[in-house]
Curated annotation (Swiss-Prot):
The keyword Secreted applies. It comes from the Eukaryota. Its main location: secreted. The lineage of its organism: Eukaryota, Amoebozoa, Evosea, Eumycetozoa, Dictyostelia. It comes from Dictyostelium discoideum. It is found in: Secreted. This is Putative uncharacterized protein DDB_G0275629. Residues 1-25 form the signal peptide.
Length: 56
């Protein structure tokens, strides 16, 4: 019987060759377009009224 430690290098080698062979024949093109529009309107109105009345 083989142990997991003995089987792992063989599996890694098989996967390595499988992916390296696919990498030479596979072309992937990804295009991402992101549009962000932010509109912020801030209106601040401050009114201060002071009335002074003096009576003699």
């Amino acid at each position: 019987m083989f142990t997991l430690k003995e089987n792992n290098p063989s599996l890694i080698t098989i996967f390595f060759f499988f992916f390296s062979n696919n990498a030479t024949t596979t072309t992937t093109t990804t295009t991402t377009t992101t549009t962000t529009t932010t509109t912020t309107t801030t209106t601040t109105t401050t009114t201060t009224a002071t009335t002074t009345t003096t009576t003699f």
